[in-house]
Amino acid sequence: MTAKIGIVGSGNIGWALKQMLREDYEIRQGDITDGFDASNIEHVKKFLTGLDAVISAGPFSVNKNIAGIASKEGIAYFDLTEDVETTDFIRGLKSKSILMPQCGLAPGAINICAAGMMEEFDSVSEVLMRVGALPRFTTNEMSYYLSWSTNGLINEYCNEADAIYEGKAVKLMPLEGAEKIVIEGESFEAFNTSGGCATMCETFEDKVENLTYKTIRYPGHLNHMKFLFNDLHLKKNKDCLLYTSDAADEP
């Protein structure tokens, strides 16, 4: 019997998930463009009926609804959220099924890789996680192409970043801590963003001296973001920021 998997969202990530899973599973996909509103509890209940698992590839704001109902119905739940508060909510749910948030590149794969490498050593003094989903070539002033959620990106850039400093869990300001990275002769910049550490600061507090996560971008991107978020105070007007970011990302 083929397992039934639901995918919430049919954007770039939702589309990719369907391509990867459709040959081995029965897929049900729902998106706001099809009339499925994941912020509506009744819509979510109907969508989840009969599923074995659900993957949320929608905005993080709908994940509490989906995870909450999945936990009650015993449906396995996965998402790719970077939102710390949403993750804490899901971790607090009780269910007989698997509830696994933060299954993306970062948080997700980068944390598995880092934790796996740490296990190879008797003691670890410093862990530096640096991740950037970048286009090979850029065509706009922001030197970036958004391949995932605009809401998620704004969330990463607005909220505090988790880190471990001198063995203790701390909070760092987003868009700060800039550093230069050179990869195969090409220069990049990296800076603090929220969510990338997942729960590592909780897991490894007092077990590692320093642990940080930063997002990699092409040079100049950070200055543009600081202008939008800080100088224009758009971090306090996220609707305007969302519109601006989407408009700038159009081809």
Where are the predicted features?
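Glycine-rich Rossmann-fold phosphate-binding loop(s) that bind the pyrophosphate
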Residues: 10
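Adenosine-cofactor binding site in Rossmann-like domains, unifying the SAM/SAH pocket
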Residues: 31-42
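Single conserved hydrophobic/aromatic residue that forms the stacking wall/gate
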Residues: 243-251
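Active-site-lining helix/loop region of Rossmann-like oxidoreductase modules
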Residues: 122-241
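N-terminal glycine-rich "phosphate-gripper" loop used for MgATP/nucleotide binding
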Residues: 53-67, 74, 79-86
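Hydrophobic/small residue at the entry helix of a nucleotide-binding pocket
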Residues: 13
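Rossmann-fold NAD(P)-binding glycine/threonine-rich loop
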Residues: 82-99
